[in-house]
Every structure is written in structure tokens, then in C-alpha cells.
């Protein structure tokens, strides 16, 4: 077999520039002919003919001169070129001078391999007419009878066949050199001279550099424009053209770091070459094709071994760097964006639907950076557990679009922010909360007057539309309200009543005691005791219009739990003791009282930190802001005599206190007595899905209990039951068996009735959850035959109830919560009652509870006066007792503020985040700014991080807000190196907030240094304290997870002892 050196000696290259002619457009063109002749076989000649103008020669001269200067540093040896002139350019002398200079330039390049192998010369002859030796009979000029006939041929005849064949002559060394240049960011010969491979000629060899001087003649000849093995006849070149196209695509994919696709194209090209070479007649050409085929096959195998996808038996192993190379078919053209329809905007991403498959995705756009950096390698993870999946990506001229999985559960903080003691201004994205400068307290009592039932009917019908998901913003204190960004918008809030003047811009005093002092100092205005019609009861007569208004809105859906519960409300008017109930009209004084800060008045009972997550019943009743329903009072009617009621109103003005301090535990909203008993329900928050699920179980016992005897009815049940307890289940529907739904029944709110009378209707609410933290929240609605209603903590410590509602109506009661306040007229603190009138105001409070209520002392601050002779009345204690009331409220608030998310849930969430971060670190990705906005939930309640990737064309950025809130490690944004330890700090900051209920920056506003001791409440376990302390180390080298063992140090920490890591990896 002949060597490259021998073949190079056999080839001679000749260039001629002839026949200058005037182009129809007015400029002069020259015919350029390039011939390659074999010295051993002079008949073996190949020829290319192109027509060029002066500007083309000038451009080629400049490019070849630059290459020659970089190689030899002797620019004076390079042939000069004629200068361009405007006038006289059509003179024969000027044309001849230009023709001669062009011919000298081409002939000079024929003797230097770096020039005749250059891409510039290849582009110069692209599009020319190719002639073989059999066609070269006679002079070459015989092919162009006229200039006009030749130009169309030049434009239609391509030079692709020659370049395709040349692409097959690239040796494996040049390919390796190109790949090494991309991997090590070194300047390859192509980039040294500022040259780039185009898609048409990317397989051509690079321009020779200084290092190429040491290469053998064989290597340089392999990249020749006219290879040693001359082309076969036109009829036999089809397989070479197809194979050349595939090799070009393979090189292009290698440049894009898509090695899997490159290997595929290499193998397809090899298959074509092996199939086509079987019919090759020339032994020299056959050997050349086989040699190149072997080199391409070796290249494909080396790519597969280095970047191939894992085998099937390796699927169970943790994801490594192999998963960061996405399948080449994940990339889609920019035109595919037309197939997506935008459904909404969620934070900074789009919720879209693929119109072809009707599937929902998240579309995230990454803006390309103006500075392209080869230092950043593109890493596109696709096998990271507990992180949203990438379906495809689309690269446009300005952006990279990621089509991601939609985490249907939304953000974790959307659900747990209710239990984090953060004020609205401290939430991640919250609007300003203004404060009023003056507030009023209104006391209103029932009075006798005729009243129609129109407003009651409208209220009753509106109850059907109130059955929305519970909001999660209003909580124990204003500091726990959170308005962080939501992943799951779209849930409408309950419609506000027309006469509702309530506003979310309420002010809070610093203490109930302060409120009490102010209340005692103010003078009650006598003129404010305005008479107002309230209720009408006429013997045994029944207001059929008022009664019919109840079932009017219940017939729509008799299967829902809300409808089943309302069905029992129809029994509020039994046949043996019917009473007509109508609704009051809204007075001006009531409308003015809407802006009173007292309308948030409540005490929330939250027990130990070991309780599972749930919404306390008190917040269900009193967290919403719209006009409350006025109470209805029905008295035992022994003689069927008609009852009438008087309404009086007292007004107290006081200055609002200063704005509460951020994170203050004793800051509680001020609520009017009027609004305390019957809080409004229309101010539901938008976009707040509730994890509570209403279970329709055990409703049969409700019907039986309601049917056992005559039932009394109060509007309290309407306002609470219809508008608070009944909500639609959210996406996190928990599948619990009937046995799991059984728990201790909890007593309800009893209406104001004779203790010796028939049993009253009651509602019970259950708050419990499974021990498995994945089953987050459960709420059930039930009924009991007891005359009282409350939410009691279960005797099982795993199922301790939240938000205990208690009632105190009899002397032997062991509960406290239902307060009957007699507001005496003329300031006399004495009991006033008669058979005709009763002036009372009802205030319902939630108080703290222990697990065993039977052991409690009766602690009702306002109880039914047992010494009163047979009269249904209530006694208001003196000023001293009122003072003690508010002191007790402050103490109970401090106890309620100690509620935290159970560590069992946090442990599960933390373990899932550790697995996700470890997988990202194996891919080579450091999140740096992991914060609550990156923590999502799937439809089953498991953690899913937002998608993290790295792109060479996209500049790495860090969330400035996360840095300010100390979710980022101290070294982020500094001059020190950012390592994987940054993410372990972020994990510690997130866990700190989950465990303590406050953000890290709130507890340590001055930052954390090497000697900082973290402030954590006593309820946090020692294991959790140790974990947080080790994660939040100022020195990244001392941080847990930054040692030699890496993430194994975190997994082996005692806090994660119950975690089955093997199960999480599945």
C-alpha cells in the first residue's frame, strides 16, 4: 500500500485564471480552473471551474496572507495583490494585472499544504463545475461556450460531493484534537486563527498551526482539498455523499456536547461506508474507505464508552454524572413553542398545556448571556429524585426554554406558613399592611322589634357559595400570616357580602391587658345605645318563608358532605316546638364597626409541638374577615307566649397601639366583643388550597342524634357550620380507612337554652392525622348527642387535637369558652332579666385545653348564674374579673404560640431534600440559593425541588432575596469558593425555620459568625438542635456534609435515625 508521502509526490496542482469577461451586471469576472494531476498516471485528472470577480480574489488574498504570516512570520515572501481602483478598472491593463496577481496567489498556495488545505480555499472553489478525467478531452475551456450559459451551471452545481468526500478523509487524530480543544478550553488550530467550522465543511481539517509543522506529510495530506485517492465516477459516489452528511452531523453533535447523538451518527455513517465499499472497483479507493471506516468506528466506540447511558442493571444505583447528558431527542426546535398554550403565570414561570396531548407542563425561560463562556459546561440532569423532571428543552436565539413537570401540590410553604410565626411583612413576597389610626369597639345586644327575613334568606343562600378551601394566611398571630408566592393559584375566595366593610388592614395592640386598660378608661357614650330591630317570634307560629330559605340551596348536591350536614339543619324547627327565625338588618353602627381591630378577637388553643399538622378550629371560625352574622336567641316557650328582644349598642373609642414588632409573640389582634362571637367568613384568601379533607363518614350517627328529640337552633351554628367547617377537599386527598377516621368525639357549641330542656343540636370536629408524616392533615365533621360542643385532644398523644372549642353552660361543666356577657344598662353591674326582655351579648372564645378535661377545674370566667331562680340569664363579673380575663388571655396566647410543626414531618421532608441535593452534587450542580420558593410538593405530598441545571450559554445567578434572608451560605457572593457545602447551609436554614417557626434572619438579624449560638425553643429535640448547629457553621470546611464522607455524615446523623434511605432512593 502506497504511503501518503508517495501519493503526495504523485499529485501536482495547477491553477489558471483566464477569460476575463464583463458580467451582465456590469463587473468583470475571471474564469478560475484548478487541476490535480497524478504524476504516475497523467490521464487521471480532476478539474474544478469557477467564475470569480476581483473582490473575491482580494478577500482570498487577505485570508491566505494572514494564515501565512501566522505560520512563517515572513509576510514579505507572500505575493502582493493589485490595489483596487474606481476609475479605469475596466482598462485592459488593469484587468490583466488583476488576473496575473490572482493566478500568482493561487499558484503560490499550491506549494504550501497549510494554504491549499485551508477552509478559505475550500470556500473559494465551492459551487464550481467538477470534471473528471474522462470528460477532460480537449481544452478545458470547451465546457463554457458562453459566459451567460455557464453562470446558471455555477449556481446550481454544488461542490458538496467533493467536500463530502473530503469529510471522509479526516483522521481520528484531528477529531481527537478538536474534542480535546473543547474539553480543555484550549485554543485549537481553528480558534487560533479565528476560523470556525461551518455545517457544510465541519469535517474538513483545521488550518495548520505551529504544531502542524511537526506532523507527518501523511497527516497533512489526509486533509487535502484534493485527496490522494481520486474520486470515483459520479454514478458511484452516492454512498460517499450520504456517509459524509452523517459524519458532518456527528461532528456537529460532538461540538454541542451531545455525545450520544454523535455516536449514533458515526455508526450510521460507518454502516453506509461498509455497504457501499463492497462494489468499489478501485483498490486504492477501497482501502481508503476501509481505513476511514475503521477510524470512525473507533471514534464512535470511544464516545460510547465515555458518555454512554447506564446499563439496565444499573438503574437502581444512585444517579451520577451519566444522567447529566440528556437524550438528544429531548431537544426540540423553536417552532414547537407554537404547540403550547399558556394557562397562567406562576411566579416567574408559565403554566402551559400541550395542545397536541392536552398535558400540563411548566415552561421556564432562561435568558442567554451576552458573554459566552466555555468554562461553564452544560449539565442537564434528568434522573434526580425528588426534583421535577425535564421533558424537553428548546434553544432559541436568545433563550433556553425548559418544559418541566408540573408539581401539582404547589409550594410547601403555602401549607405550613400558617404554623410559622412570621408577620406579613416578613413573608417572602408580601404586600404592605397599613394601620388605622383610630378604632372603635361596639357592643350590641338584641332588642325587640319586627323584622323581615329577607336578609336572612340572602345570607342563607350565600352559605352555599362559602364552601371553599380554607385560607391559610390568617393564623394565631399576625406574624404567622404568610403571603408567599403560590404554585397553585386559581381558587377563588368566598364572595364578600355587600354590607361587609371589613378590611385586612387591621392594627394590633401589644397586649390584651393594654386593651383592657384602655377599655376601662374610655367613657361609654349614652347616645350610642340605639334601638334596633332584631328578631320576631310569635307563639307557635312558624315563619314559613324563613324556614324554606334553608333547604333552598341544599337541593343542588345531596351527596357532598356539606349538603349532608345542612340536611340536619332542617331539623332545627321540630313540629312540637316551632319557632320562627328571621334576620336583622344591617345598621349604620354595625357597618362602622367593621374596621374595628377588635374583630379578630380570639384565643387559639394549640397544644404541644408533637401534634401533627392541622388547622385549629379557632382559626377556622375567626380568621376570616367579612360581616358577622348577628346572634339569634330562642327561649324556652312554656306558655307559647311570644318573646321579644331589645337591642342596645354601646360604643367605646380608643387609640390604636403602635405597630407590633416583627416576630413578637405577644402581638395579638384586637377584636370587638360584637365580632368575637360571630366572625365573618367572606374574607377568604385567594390561591390558598387547604390540605384538610372533609370525610363524610359517621354522618349517620348525626342524623340519629339530631332526631332524638326537639332541637333548638341558634344562628351561631349557621355562621360556624355553613361558612367555616365545610370546605372542598384540595389536591392532597388522603385515603384513610373508616377505622382511621374514628377518634374521640369532641363536644360542640351549645346554644343558649334551658339546661333541663331537650338535647340541643351540636357539631363535633376532629383533628388528627396518621403517624405517617406523608398523610399530612385530616379533618372530619361529626355530630354527637351531647348538649355541648368542643374539640378535645385525643387521649392518644399521636392524635392530639388542635384548636379546642369549649362550652360552659352548666355548673358541673369542666370546660371554658362560651361566655355570656350581660351588658347592663346605665352602667349597673347587676343581673337584669325579665319575662319580656333579655339584653345579652354572646362572646365565643377558644381557650387552652389539656388532654384530660375530666380532671380540670371549672374555669369558666363567665358562667350561667346557677343561683338565679329558673331564669335564663348570665352574670357579668366586676372590673377586677375583666382585668383578669385579659391577663389570662395573654398567658394563653403565649402558650398557644408554642405550637410547632412536628419533627416527624420535618424529618421526612429533610431526608427527601438531602437525597435530591446529593444527586445534584453528583451531577456537578450546586444550587447555592436553595430557599422556600424552590421547595414544592407533588400530588402525594412528597418534596420536589424546582429544576436545577447549568448551561454554558446562561450566566449563573443567585437570588438576592435569598441572600438577604440568610438562606444562602456566607461564602455565596464573596471571594471564597462556592462548594457543595453551600447547599448544606441552605438546608440548615430551611430546617431552622421549619423547626422553630421563625426565619434565621429574624432570630439572628446580625448574621452568624464562628461563635454564634443558635436560638431555638425548648421544644426542639436535641438531635434536631445538633443537626442545625452543624449545618449552620460559618466555616464551610467545618460544616456537616463538607468532610471526607460527604453526604454520608448527614445521613448518619441521629436526627435521621428512623429514615430508611434505601426506600427514599427507590
From Swiss-Prot:
Annotated coiled-coil segments of the chain: none
- Where is this chain compositionally biased, Basic and acidic residues type? 212-223
Q: Which reaction does it catalyse?
A: L-seryl-[protein] + ATP = O-phospho-L-seryl-[protein] + ADP + H(+); L-threonyl-[protein] + ATP = O-phospho-L-threonyl-[protein] + ADP + H(+)
Q: Which locations, inside or outside the cell, does it occupy?
A: Cytoplasm; Membrane; Early endosome
Q: Which InterPro entries match?
A: Intracell_Sig-Traffick_Protein (IPR051866), Kinase-like_dom_sf (IPR011009), MIT_dom (IPR007330), MIT_dom_sf (IPR036181), Prot_kinase_dom (IPR000719), PX_dom (IPR001683), PX_dom_sf (IPR036871), PX_S6K-delta-1 (IPR042132)
> What's the superkingdom here?
Eukaryota
Q: Per its UniProt entry, what is the enzyme's top EC class, as one word?
A: transferase
User: Which stretches does the entry tag as region Disordered?
Assistant: 207-228, 441-509, 553-596
Q: Give GO cellular component annotations, separated by semicolons.
A: early endosome; endosome; lysosome; membrane
In the record, biological process GO terms are:
signal transduction
- Record annotation: effect of changing residue 1022 to K: In a breast infiltrating ductal carcinoma sample; somatic mutation
Phosphoserine modifications at: 282, 423, 427, 449, 455, 494, 528, 583, 605, 608, 640, 661, 664, 667, 794, 872
Q: Residue ranges under compositional bias (Low complexity)?
A: 448-458, 492-503, 582-593
Q: Where is the PX domain?
A: 8-132
Q: Recorded E.C. number(s)?
A: 2.7.11.1
Q: What is its main location?
A: cytoplasm
Give the quaternary structure: Interacts with SPHK1 and phosphatidylinositol 3-phosphate. Interacts (via PX domain) with PRDX3.
Report the protein name in the record.
Ribosomal protein S6 kinase delta-1
Which species? Answer: Homo sapiens
Encoding gene, per UniProt annotation = RPS6KC1
Amino acid at each position: 500500500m502506497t504511503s501518503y508521502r508517495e501519493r503526495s509526490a504523485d499529485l501536482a496542482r495547477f491553477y489558471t485564471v483566464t477569460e476575463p469577461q464583463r458580467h451582465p451586471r456590469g463587473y468583470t469576472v475571471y474564469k478560475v480552473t484548478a487541476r490535480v494531476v497524478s504524476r504516475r498516471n497523467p490521464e487521471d485528472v480532476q478539474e474544478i471551474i469557477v467564475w470569480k470577480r476581483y473582490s473575491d480574489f482580494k478577500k482570498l488574498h487577505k485570508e491566505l496572507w494572514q494564515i501565512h504570516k501566522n505560520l512563517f512570520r515572513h509576510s514579505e515572501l507572500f505575493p502582493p495583490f493589485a490595489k483596487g481602483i474606481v476609475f479605469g478598472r475596466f482598462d485592459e491593463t488593469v484587468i490583466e494585472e488583476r488576473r496575473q496577481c490572482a493566478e500568482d496567489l493561487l499558484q503560490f498556495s499550491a506549494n504550501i499544504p497549510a494554504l491549499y488545505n485551508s477552509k478559505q480555499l475550500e470556500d473559494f472553489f465551492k459551487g464550481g463545475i467538477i470534471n473528471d478525467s474522462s470528460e477532460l478531452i480537449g481544452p478545458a475551456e470547451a465546457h463554457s461556450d458562453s459566459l451567460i450559459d455557464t453562470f446558471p451551471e455555477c449556481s446550481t452545481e454544488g461542490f458538496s460531493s467533493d467536500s463530502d468526500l473530503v469529510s471522509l478523509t479526516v483522521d481520528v487524530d484531528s477529531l481527537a484534537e478538536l474534542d480535546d480543544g473543547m474539553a480543555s478550553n484550549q485554543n485549537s488550530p481553528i480558534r487560533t486563527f479565528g476560523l470556525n467550522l461551518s455545517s457544510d465543511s465541519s469535517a474538513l481539517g483545521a488550518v495548520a498551526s505551529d504544531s502542524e509543522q511537526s506532523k507527518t506529510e501523511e497527516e497533512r495530506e489526509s486533509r487535502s482539498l484534493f485527496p490522494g485517492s481520486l474520486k470515483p465516477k459520479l454514478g458511484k459516489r452516492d454512498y460517499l455523499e450520504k456517509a459524509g452528511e452523517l459524519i458532518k452531523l456527528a461532528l456537529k453533535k460532538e461540538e454541542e456536547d451531545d455525545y450520544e447523538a454523535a455516536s449514533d451518527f458515526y455508526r450510521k455513517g460507518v454502516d453506509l461506508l461498509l455497504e457501499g465499499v463492497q462494489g468499489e472497483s478501485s483498490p486504492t479507493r477501497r482501502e481508503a474507505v476501509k481505513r476511514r471506516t475503521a477510524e470512525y468506528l473507533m471514534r464512535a466506540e470511544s464516545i460510547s464508552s465515555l458518555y454512554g447511558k447506564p446499563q439496565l442493571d444499573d438503574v437502581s444505583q444512585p444517579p451520577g454524572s451519566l444522567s447529566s447528558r440528556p437524550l438528544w431527542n429531548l431537544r426540540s426546535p423553536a417552532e414547537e413553542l407554537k404547540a403550547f398554550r399558556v394557562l397562567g403565570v406562576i411566579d416567574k414561570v408559565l403554566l402551559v398545556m400541550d395542545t397536541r396531548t392536552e398535558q400540563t407542563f411548566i415552561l421556564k425561560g432562561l435568558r442567554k448571556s451576552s458573554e459566552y463562556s466555555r468554562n461553564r459546561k452544560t449539565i442537564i440532569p434528568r434522573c434526580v429524585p425528588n426534583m421535577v423532571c425535564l421533558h424537553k428543552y428548546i434553544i432559541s436565539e436568545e433563550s433556553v426554554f425548559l418544559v418541566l413537570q408540573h408539581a401539582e401540590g404547589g409550594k410547601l410553604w403555602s401549607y405550613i406558613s400558617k404554623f410559622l410565626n412570621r408577620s406579613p411583612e416578613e413573608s417572602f413576597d408580601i404586600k404592605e399592611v397599613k394601620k388605622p389610626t383610630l378604632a372603635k369597639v361596639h357592643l350590641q345586644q338584641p332588642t325587640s322589634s319586627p323584622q323581615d327575613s329577607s336578609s336572612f334568606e340572602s345570607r342563607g343562600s350565600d352559605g352555599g357559595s362559602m364552601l371553599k378551601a380554607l385560607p391559610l394566611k390568617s393564623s394565631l398571630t399576625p406574624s404567622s400570616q404568610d403571603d408567599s408566592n403560590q404554585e397553585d393559584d386559581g381558587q377563588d375566595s368566598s364572595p364578600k357580602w355587600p354590607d361587609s366593610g371589613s378590611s385586612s388592614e387591621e392594627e394590633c395592640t401589644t397586649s390584651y391587658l393594654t386593651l383592657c386598660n384602655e377599655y376601662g378608661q374610655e367613657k361609654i357614650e349614652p347616645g350610642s345605645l340605639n334601638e334596633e330591630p332584631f328578631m320576631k317570634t310569635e307563639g307557635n307560629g312558624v315563619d314559613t318563608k324563613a324556614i324554606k330559605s334553608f333547604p333552598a340551596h341544599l337541593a343542588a348536591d345531596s351527596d357532598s358532605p356539606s349538603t349532608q350536614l345542612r340536611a340536619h339543619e332542617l331539623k332545627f324547627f321540630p313540629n312540637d316546638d316551632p319557632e320562627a327565625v328571621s334576620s336583622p338588618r344591617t345598621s349604620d353602627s354595625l357597618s362602622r364597626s367593621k374596621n374595628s381591630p377588635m374583630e379578630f378577637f380570639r384565643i387559639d388553643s394549640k397544644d404541644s409541638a408533637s401534634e401533627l399538622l392541622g388547622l385549629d378550629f379557632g382559626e377556622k371560625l375567626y380568621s376570616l374577615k367579612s360581616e358577622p352574622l348577628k346572634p339569634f336567641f330562642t327561649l324556652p316557650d312554656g306558655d307559647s307566649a311570644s318573646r321579644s328582644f331589645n337591642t342596645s349598642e354601646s360604643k367605646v373609642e380608643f387609640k390604636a397601639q403602635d405597630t407590633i414588632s416583627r416576630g413578637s409573640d405577644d402581638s395579638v389582634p384586637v377584636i370587638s366583643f360584637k365580632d368575637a362571637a360571630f366572625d365573618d367568613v367572606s374574607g377568604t384568601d385567594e390561591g390558598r388550597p387547604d390540605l384538610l379533607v372533609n370525610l363524610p363518614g359517621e354522618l349517620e350517627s348525626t342524623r340519629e342524634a339530631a332526631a332524638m328529640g326537639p332541637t333548638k337552633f341558634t344562628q351561631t351554628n349557621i355562621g360556624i357550620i355553613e361558612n367555616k367547617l365545610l370546605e372542598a377537599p384540595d389536591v392532597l386527598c388522603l385515603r384513610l380507612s373508616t377505622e382511621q377516621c374514628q377518634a374521640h368525639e369532641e363536644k360542640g357549641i351549645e346554644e343558649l337554652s334551658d339546661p333541663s330542656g331537650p338535647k340541643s343540636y351540636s357539631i363535633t370536629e376532629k383533628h388528627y392525622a396518621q403517624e405517617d408524616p406523608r398523610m399530612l392533615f385530616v379533618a372530619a365533621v361529626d355530630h354527637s348527642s351531647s348538649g355541648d360542643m368542643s374539640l378535645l385532644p385525643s387521649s392518644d398523644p399521636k392524635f392530639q387535637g388542635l384548636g379546642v372549642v369549649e362550652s360552659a353552660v352548666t355548673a358541673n361543666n369542666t370546660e371554658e369558652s362560651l361566655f355570656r356577657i350581660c351588658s347592663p344598662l346605665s352602667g349597673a353591674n347587676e343581673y337584669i332579666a325579665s319575662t319580656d326582655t333579655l339584653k345579652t351579648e354572646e362572646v365565643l372564645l377558644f381557650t387552652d385545653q389539656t388532654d384530660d378535661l375530666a380532671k380540670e377545674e371549672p374555669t369558666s370566667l363567665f358562667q350561667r348564674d346557677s343561683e338565679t331562680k329558673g331564669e335564663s340569664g348570665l352574670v357579668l363579673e366586676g372590673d377586677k374579673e375583666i382585668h383578669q380575663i385579659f391577663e389570662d388571655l395573654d398567658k394563653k396566647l403565649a402558650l398557644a404560640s408554642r405550637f410547632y410543626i412536628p419533627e416527624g414531618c420535618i424529618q421526612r421532608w429533610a431526608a427527601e431534600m438531602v437525597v435530591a441535593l446529593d444527586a445534584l452534587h453528583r451531577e456537578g450542580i450546586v444550587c447555592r440559593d436553595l430557599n422556600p420558593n424552590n421547595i414544592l410538593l407533588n400530588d402525594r405530598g412528597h418534596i420536589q425541588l424546582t429544576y436545577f441545571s447549568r448551561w454554558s450559554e446562561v450566566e449563573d445567578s443567585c437570588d438576592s432575596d435569598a441572600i438577604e434572608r440568610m438562606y444562602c451560605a456566607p461564602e455565596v457572593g464573596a471571594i471564597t469558593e462556592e462548594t457543595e457545602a453551600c447547599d448544606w447551609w441552605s438546608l440548615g436554614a430551611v430546617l431552622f425555620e421549619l423547626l422553630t417557626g421563625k426565619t434565621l434572619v429574624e432570630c439572628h438579624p446580625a448574621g452568624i459568625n464562628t461563635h454564634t449560638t443558635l436560638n431555638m425553643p425548648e421544644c426542639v429535640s436535641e438531635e434536631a438542635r445538633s443537626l442545625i448547629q452543624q449545618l449552620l457553621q460559618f466555616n464551610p470546611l467545618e460544616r456537616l456534609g463538607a468532610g471526607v464522607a460527604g453526604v454520608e455524615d448527614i445521613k448518619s446523623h441521629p436526627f435521621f435515625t428512623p429514615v430508611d434511605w434505601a426506600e427514599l432512593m427507590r
